[in-house]
A protein has these predicted regions:
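A short His-aromatic
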Residues: 130-131
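A short acidic, Gly/Pro-enriched loop at the edge of an enzyme's catalytic core
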Residues: 113-122
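Residues lining the SAM
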Residues: 124-126, 155
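Conserved class I S-adenosyl-L-methionine
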Residues: 1-52, 65, 151-163
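Class I SAM-dependent methyltransferase SAM/SAH-binding core
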Residues: 55-111
């Protein structure tokens, strides 16, 4: 896709519309999360291992549940998302739960201009990469942020799930 600006704008509006709906849904189970339940499943936890003290960049963090679950595991977390409403909710959750986390609202393609750090780990999960018009460019963003020997941890659904 040569000009993704309208695509990005529409995508942002869509995700802004979904934030409060998602936060109120049983799928995200905010009550359990607020009481300390991790949103990370067995597969993700096995892939992550011990992340205590590691710097983690969570791309497409939505409203920060997984980011804050990573923080509960001892990681130093930065979450990035296109939706300004999601980032606002992530910041509110971090404050409410007294958890450390930095949240940046940005077009992920532009993240290297806004986040001046390298990370031990880049994490993204479920329904994230299907929204990008240029996966090669997205992969370049991931590579940009990884320290030498850093890892990308990615868990996602097969696209057929949504058909």
């Amino acid at each position: 896709m040569k000009d993704a600006s309208n695509y990005i704008k529409l995508n942002k509006a869509t995700w802004n519309d979904k934030v409060d709906v998602h936060m109120a849904s049983s799928f995200y189970d905010m009550e359990a999360f607020l009481q300390g339940k991790s949103t990370l499943n067995e597969i993700e936890l096995a892939l992550l291992g011990d992340i205590s003290g590691k710097k983690v960049l969570h791309l497409q963090c939505h409203f920060g549940q997984d980011s804050l679950s990573l923080a509960r595991m001892g990681a130093q977390v930065t979450g990035a998302d296109l939706s300004d409403k999601a980032i606002q909710r992530a910041q509110e959750l971090a404050e409410k739960l007294n958890l450390e986390g930095t949240f940046v609202c940005c077009d992920i393609y532009e993240a290297p201009k806004l986040i001046d750090e390298k990370f031990d780990l880049v994490f993204t999960s479920y329904g994230t990469i299907g929204w990008f018009p240029d996966l090669e460019r997205w992969a370049g963003v991931v590579a940009h942020f990884l320290k030498p020997n850093g890892q990308l941890i990615m868990a996602d659904f097969h696209p057929v799930v949504w058909m």
